[in-house]
Amino acid sequence: MPVMKGLLAPQNTFLDTIATRFDGTHSNFLLANAQGPRGFPIVYCSDGFCELTGYGRTEVMQKTCSCRFLYGPETSEPALQRLQKALEGHQEHRAEICFYRKDGSAFWCLLDMMPIKNELGEVVLFLFSFKDISQSGGPGLGSPGIHGDNNNHENSLGRRGASSRLRSTRRQNRTVLHRLTGHFGRRDQGSVKANSNVFEPKPSVPEYKVASVGGSRCLLLHYSIPKAVWDGLILLATFYVAVTVPYNVCFAGDDDTPITSRHTLVSDIAVEMLFILDIILNFRTTYVSQSGQVVSAPRSIGLHYLATWFFVDLIAALPFDLLYVFNITVTSLVHLLKTVRLLRLLRLLQKLERYSQCSAVVLTLLMSVFALLAHWMACVWYVIGRREMEANDPLLWDIGWLHELGKRLEEPYVNGSAGGPSRRSAYIAALYFTLSSLTSVGFGNVCANTDAEKIFSICTMLIGALMHAVVFGNVTAIIQRMYSRRSLYHSRMKDLKDFIRVHRLPRPLKQRMLEYFQTTWAVNSGIDANELLRDFPDELRADIAMHLNREILQLPLFGAASRGCLRALSLHIKTSFCAPGEFLLRRGDALQAHYYVCSGSLEVLRDNTVLAILGKGDLIGADIPELGQEPGAGAGCVLKTSADVKALTYCGLQQLSSRGLAEVLRLYPEYVAAFRAGLPRDLTFNLRQGSENNGLGRFSRSPRLSQARSDTLGSSSDKTLPSITETEGGMEPGAGSKPRRPLLLPNLSPARPRGSLVSLLGEELPPFSALVSSPSLSPTPSPALAGRGSSPSLHGPPRGSAAWKPPQLLTPPLGTFGPPDLSPRIVDGIEDSSNTAEAPTFRFSKRPEPTRTRSQAPLSGPRLSRELATEAAEEVKEKVCRLNQEISRLNQEVSQLSRELRQVMGLLQARLGPPSHPPDSTWLPDLPCPHQRPPCISPHMSGPPPGLQNTTLAVVHCPASVGTVEIGATPSELRSSMVPPFPSEPDPLGPSPVPEASPLTPSLLKHSFQSGSDTFH
């Protein structure tokens, strides 16, 4: 993988700086929001403060920074007032206050409050530093009133004795020592030196802003363009050293010419100057630490360079050639020290990492390495020939390869050392031999004759075979095996760049994508843990996941969980990464996981106001809003975030998905209660909307509320219909005192059987089937309704008695109902599918409903939310559908009833005999019908005819074969329109006997049976 640029995004390292600076006695601190809407809430608290006070971080967060939870009986009220005044004025404040821990124990605390500003100069945070001074001679816990700052002590000196003065002096001395502690150098072990500003005010704390990378102009960024140009120049110099140093050591050392006259002397000195300058620049060049941070501190840079490459670069930069220039005599072994410069080739490999993704560069590098190896071996081959000549007698020994070369070139050696071929010819011949030996078996024109030469030739052939196989044979396969991860990185990076180019993404978004990819790859090296562990058994995968996620599993929240539960949870935890400035969550987003901060810091924002600052070890998420609902279980439990979560630095996070948590809780129900109780305690900040006021996120849909709401909605749509009742005694029409009964449906009246007509139409409607099911045709009272006083008796006094009165028609006024309410569609029960929700409801009742004006209608729209209105409409539609089904079943029962009535009328006619009136008359005496069906009023009748006082008119309209009964028409009005049921033949039974107790006014009972339409008169 190419060399990392490092984590270059601008970071807000305020939290890390505060934690680093306030170490030791100043590790107890709080951060409060200075722009908060509700009394400067605490947005961060250190672990030292939690240990000092005994409160947990969750208990402290979002409380006011005045720390009222630490107050007690001996806490000075004037000191608290001065603290509040300093907060309101955004001023620095110092005081000694008696606070109380969670267990109730008191302690004296030196409180420092300092405002923190941003880059615009605005006070955005308050920093509170707490120092326990109870053990260092602080004020006695039994002497309340000695609180506050030094001004308060000066005012109280006159009223107190010597002990008070002594304590005040101790406090002043302690303040001076406290300031001296911050100004004396801690790392100076030899001598302690105080700064010149010992008694000056303390230096200001860091600002809450984004820090820039590379604050000094004298620093050279390791990823800048000038640094890249310089690295290229050093690369060429390193190649030059790799070529010239072996050549000068092997060939120039045996030359009698002076070194000062060498052609490469100037270039050698220039390269040495470049190396010396490179050493100087390395002390001012930033580098990337192991954690991925860009280090720009000069001291850290120097220490890092001294510990890594300084000594190698120093030896390579020793000016050996300058010794020759000044005619300083050196031994021949000094020339060998120049070979140490070849160690810079290791730096060369490091520099070439960033260019390794280019195939042309890789090919050039491989060929250069092959040629460089041949060059080095040619130098060694020449040295072997020279040493063979020096070791043997020059007069008798002439079988070396240099002698053979001199003979062929007609430049033989004289006396073993003089003469011979030139240095140039010897180097070319040596390079030719090594290349032919490395690439093949050679041609024999330059061959090895001596034992040393043959041994070297053998080694050259072996190396050549290896290099030939590696470079020209299996180089691609070897590189793929060795650098498969790098190849994957390059392929993904290329795909990412192609994606950016094709979609023309803006430059800021492009930079964010590239940096996120590089940093995440640096963290996990491109290894997908889930893909890697997929083939492992579940037992081993769970153990590995528990080890990788051990930080989040060590929270007290999971302390009550069993090992099996922890293993299941660990399989649903994922590691994520967030760059500075990136939003982890935005307000209103669906919260799909709980996040644990492993490293870095984040801030919680709402309307650009800092609500909390999160650091390592914090848990962010949301509690479970309602009992019985697990996160992610259903659409009704979707949690929305109430604030934005933004990364201040590079953050490493571990996230536990809500869906995975719900699955684990279903597998381990015994842990649900402990998790629900422990989650609010361990959450550093609750992101659930509505968590501030503990309100319900959705409207309750309990059956009781739904029923009440349906009654409210139903009452507004009910329309009053006329009803028929039989008055008792002197009751006037419309003077009923009982409220009308609603229509009873099976699902709303569990006391009634589902198939009962009484349950469908109310108690006022008698059961018609009793007439047929009765063993005798004589009228008998219904036992089911005999004892009920609320409904009229089915069998009143005998018709001939004095107490008997004919039934009367009771109709409400015309203003009570309008024409739409009297539509036959409503009476017949045929509902319009397009207007089902607004269909009026009809009811059978004894008493008409009072007139309801439009202004008295219940207001459902303005008072109900959109969701409530939708639910109400669905419930109304469901009720209408059930009503249609019941009406259809009622039609079938009425049809069956009509057939039974025809049979009964036939039996009555056969038993009572023929009527006593003339044959052309269809009048029959009024017989008491014990099982008369209460009819419904016809929509075209608004009241009884004026001439009728003792009769009742009723017309029953029933859908699908329902009969009609007309009672109360005068003989003159009806004879013209009525047709006798059997006009062609007389009644075989004869006239019916008229009871003696019947009134003088005749009544009409017209019986007409029609088989096609099932209508009877």
From Swiss-Prot:
Residues 873-907 form a coiled coil. Gene3D superfamilies: 1.10.1200.260, 1.10.287.70, Jelly Rolls, PAS domain. Residues 703-726, 1008-1017 have a biased composition (Polar residues). Glycans are attached at residue 415. It catalyses: K(+)(in) = K(+)(out). One of its GO terms (biological process) is regulation of membrane potential. It comes from the Eukaryota. Residues 557-621 are annotated as: cNMP-binding domain. CDD domains: CAP_ED (cd00038), PAS (cd00130). Residues 771-786, 806-820 have a biased composition (Low complexity). One of its GO terms (molecular function) is voltage-gated potassium channel activity. Its main location: membrane. Residues 139-170, 690-749, 771-870, 972-1017 are annotated as: Disordered. Keywords: Coiled coil, Glycoprotein, Ion channel, Ion transport, Membrane, Potassium, Potassium channel, Potassium transport, Transmembrane, Transmembrane helix, Transport, Voltage-gated channel. InterPro entries: cNMP-bd_dom, cNMP-bd_dom_sf, Ion_trans_dom, K_chnl_volt-dep_EAG/ELK/ERG, K_chnl_volt-dep_ELK, KCNH_animal-type, PAC, PAS. One of its GO terms (cellular component) is monoatomic ion channel complex. Highly expressed in adult testis, and in adult and embryonic brain. In adult brain found in piriform cortex, olfactory tubercle, cerebral cortex, hippocampus pyramidial cells and dentate gyrus and basal ganglia of caudate/putamen and accumbens nucleus. Detected at intermediate levels in lung, spinal cord, and pituitary. The chain crosses the membrane at residues 233-253, 263-283, 306-326, 335-355, 365-385, 455-475. Belongs to the potassium channel family. H (Eag) (TC 1.A.1.20) subfamily. Kv12.3/KCNH4 sub-subfamily. PANTHER family: POTASSIUM VOLTAGE-GATED CHANNEL SUBFAMILY H MEMBER 4 (PTHR10217:SF630), VOLTAGE AND LIGAND GATED POTASSIUM CHANNEL (PTHR10217). This is Voltage-gated delayed rectifier potassium channel KCNH4.
